[in-house]
């Protein structure tokens, strides 16, 4: 395939995301990493800004030899209409052949548009999920560190993401 999308919120980007992106690169000439919910930030579900997520992804992807040539990162704001979401992506992004996702709804929407919908093998699914990482950070517990690329781990500490999540949790 020429070009595949990897869609996610990347809150924060973790090793499961890296595994999925590498898997997609094994199946396409190019991959567009779509940073979804780009308009969201400073909430428990979406604590990082789109710019912070793009920067963290770049730090993580720099380990790949040809990442600049084969990867693009595109922040995309949400729309509240699933039926037209793939068309919305077609309007915002260069042409693509399909998506790589573990999300059933995303796969269904792409299949319904006649596009490839590929499910990657899961990587430490229960352990390295954004939800678990954010929950551990918000509660001040350890265990999230091993799910992040070392560069991303340093970056989220530098921007104070664990403290941001604790403060957001207190505001609830």
UniProtKB/Swiss-Prot annotation:
<keyword id="KW-0520">NAD</keyword>
<keyword id="KW-0548">Nucleotidyltransferase</keyword>
<comment type="pathway">
    <text>Cofactor biosynthesis; NAD(+) biosynthesis; NAD(+) from nicotinamide D-ribonucleotide: step 1/1.</text>
</comment>
<dbReference type="GO" id="GO:0000309">
    <property type="term" value="F:nicotinamide-nucleotide adenylyltransferase activity"/>
</dbReference>
<dbReference type="GO" id="GO:0005524">
    <property type="term" value="F:ATP binding"/>
</dbReference>
<keyword id="KW-0067">ATP-binding</keyword>
<keyword id="KW-0963">Cytoplasm</keyword>
<dbReference type="GO" id="GO:0005737">
    <property type="term" value="C:cytoplasm"/>
</dbReference>
<dbReference type="Pfam" id="PF01467">
    <property type="entry name" value="CTP_transf_like"/>
</dbReference>
<keyword id="KW-0662">Pyridine nucleotide biosynthesis</keyword>
<protein>
    <recommendedName>
        <fullName>Nicotinamide-nucleotide adenylyltransferase</fullName>
        <ecNumber>2.7.7.1</ecNumber>
    </recommendedName>
</protein>
<comment type="similarity">
    <text>Belongs to the archaeal NMN adenylyltransferase family.</text>
</comment>
<keyword id="KW-0547">Nucleotide-binding</keyword>
<keyword id="KW-0808">Transferase</keyword>
<dbReference type="InterPro" id="IPR014729">
    <property type="entry name" value="Rossmann-like_a/b/a_fold"/>
</dbReference>
<dbReference type="InterPro" id="IPR006418">
    <property type="entry name" value="NMN_Atrans_arc"/>
</dbReference>
<dbReference type="InterPro" id="IPR004821">
    <property type="entry name" value="Cyt_trans-like"/>
</dbReference>
<dbReference type="GO" id="GO:0009435">
    <property type="term" value="P:NAD biosynthetic process"/>
</dbReference>
């Amino acid at each position: 395939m020429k070009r595949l999308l990897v869609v996610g919120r990347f809150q924060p980007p973790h090793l499961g995301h890296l595994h999925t992106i590498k898997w997609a690169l094994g199946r396409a000439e190019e991959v567009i990493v779509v940073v979804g919910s780009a308009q969201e930030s400073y909430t428990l579900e979406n604590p990082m800004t789109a710019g912070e997520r793009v920067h963290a992804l770049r730090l993580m992807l720099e380990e790949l030899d040809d990442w600049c040539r084969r990867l693009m990162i595109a922040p995309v704001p949400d729309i509240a209409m699933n039926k037209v979401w793939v068309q919305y992506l077609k309007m915002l992004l260069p042409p693509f052949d399909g998506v790589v996702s573990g999300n059933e709804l995303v796969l269904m929407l792409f299949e319904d548009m006649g596009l490839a919908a590929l499910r990657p093998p899961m990587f430490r699914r229960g352990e390295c999920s954004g939800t678990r990482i954010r929950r551990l950070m918000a509660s001040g517990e350890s265990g999230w560190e091993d799910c992040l690329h070392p560069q991303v781990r340093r970056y989220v500490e530098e921007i104070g993401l664990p403290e941001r999540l604790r403060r957001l949790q207190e505001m609830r």
